[in-house]
A protein has these predicted regions:
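Aromatic-rich peripheral "rim/lid" segments of glycoside hydrolase catalytic domains that contact
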Residues: 2-10, 19, 77-93, 97-188
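Aromatic-lined carbohydrate-recognition surfaces of secreted/lumenal glycan-active proteins
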Residues: 14-43, 93-96, 146-152
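Aromatic- and acid-rich polysaccharide-binding/catalytic face
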Residues: 28, 32-34, 47-75, 79-111
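Extracellular ectodomain segments of secreted/surface proteins
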Residues: 189-221
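Aromatic-rich carbohydrate-binding modules that target alpha-glucans
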Residues: 211, 219-262, 272-296
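N-terminal cap/lid segment of alpha/beta-hydrolase-fold proteins
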Residues: 211-214, 218-221, 245-246, 287-341
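Short substrate-entry loop that stabilizes the transition state in hydrolases
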Residues: 338-382
Length: 382
């Protein structure tokens, strides 16, 4: 800055605080406010300077501007900065918060104001970043006094509406992220996730991920070092799924925000806007396409478990359909005793659901295993 050139160093900052303390109204709190305040090296520099000012009675709080983007910073860095600052001051303000829809961040005055339509992928990334940030801020609620957004709507933002940075859109209507910020679930903030994860029973042979734990959380791992974003369609909170984060080795990992409903779930990956199946999971036909599948442990899973009992057969048959003028396929379950005598059995026809196909009842629904178990227990007559 010009002041640094005049003074030859940053000592002008202390003079500013001295004059402010001397001439400001009594009781006025003095804050040091800066951008990129989460970066470890800069966090240390701010900490060291604030420590000297605190020892001289010149500072009351620290302001973190909060000009972030959908890709960063990591909430681990923000959490570490808040933790470090809170050892010096008891008042921290988030002073200029916005999360833009590109890779730029910080308080620089040169930035991109133009852009196309905001994709649903980017909206999901922004919602996740806001949710993660406010979870960290709530963790430090004893020292974070307030959060100030850097204007009301995208129309008014210094970044421009195309950067989509604020909770209100350019027409002053609240985005979904507004509700995510406001209607958080305190129970999730304090939830303790058990680290008893094990591979899903529906994984490809030899694959460790995805994983599930005894509480119903799901954890995912995707190796895509050159990707900019990876989203799993399975998740909670109406945020479009679970956003994975890349570690230092270029591996994307993430855990669902909370326990999933028990039983079978379809899901897919969205990598940089493209839709893919998870290479670690088996595929199942649903939603009119082959999707990845995961099984969340259920309290009644014994009902459809593979047991050491006599098993029937599931046979594939083809037939000609006059109504559709096509050859069709069906699967027929026959009980373990079928064919051993001349006994005739009643027929029950099951139609698959919308978007699924004839494999669903046995693959996803385990109908054949349910029948095997009920017959073995004498609870049903084949």
């Amino acid at each position: 800055s010009a002041w640094t050139r005049i003074f030859g160093d940053n000592s002008f900052i202390e003079y500013a605080f001295q004059f402010a303390r001397k001439y400001a109204p009594e009781g006025c709190k003095l804050y040091y406010n800066d951008f990129n305040e989460y970066m470890p090296q800069k966090t240390t520099a701010i900490y060291d300077m604030a420590m000297e000012l605190k020892e001289k009675g010149l500072i009351d709080g620290i302001g973190m501007q909060g000009h972030y983007n959908v890709y960063g910073p990591s909430m681990e860095d923000v959490d570490a900065a808040l933790t470090k600052y809170s050892t010096i001051v008891k008042h921290i303000h988030i002073t200029e918060l916005d999360i833009r829809a590109n890779q730029e961040m910080g308080g620089q005055l040169n930035f991109s104001r133009d852009g196309g339509n905001i994709s649903q992928v980017v909206k999901t990334l922004q919602e996740d970043q806001y949710a993660r940030l406010f979870k960290v801020l709530r963790k430090h609620k004893d020292v974070v006094d307030n959060v100030t957004f850097w204007n009301l709507s995208d129309r008014d933002s210094w970044l421009g509406a195309r950067n989509y940075p604020l909770p209100y859109d350019e027409n002053y209507k609240p985005k979904r992220v507004y509700s995510i910020i406001k209607d958080f679930d305190p129970a999730r903030d304090n939830a303790v996730v058990k680290e008893d994860f094990r591979p899903s029973v529906l994984n490809q042979p030899g694959q460790q991920y995805p994983m599930v734990n005894s509480q119903g959380y799901a954890r995912f791992r995707v190796v895509a070092p050159d990707a900019k974003s990876v989203i799993v369609s399975l998740g909670l909170g109406g945020r479009g799924g679970t956003v994975l984060r890349k570690d230092k080795e270029g591996v994307w990992v993430g855990t669902t925000d909370g326990p999933m409903d028990e039983g079978f779930h379809y899901y897919h990956l969205t990598i940089d806007g493209g839709v893919f199946n998870d290479p670690g999971a088996k595929n199942y036909y649903g939603s009119c396409r082959w999707e990845s599948g995961i099984e969340i442990p259920a309290h009644d899973e014994d009902f459809y478990a593979m047991k050491q009992v006599p098993h029937g057969n599931v046979q594939q048959v083809y037939f000609y359909s006059k109504s559709t003028d096509t050859h069709r396929r069906a699967f027929v379950y026959t009980p373990p005793t079928y064919g051993k005598d001349k006994k005739k059995y009643p027929v029950l026809y099951l139609q698959h659901g919308w978007g699924e196909d004839e494999t669903a009842w046995s693959n996803q629904g385990h109908a054949n295993l349910i029948m095997d178990n009920l017959i073995a227990e004498g609870k049903i007559e084949p």
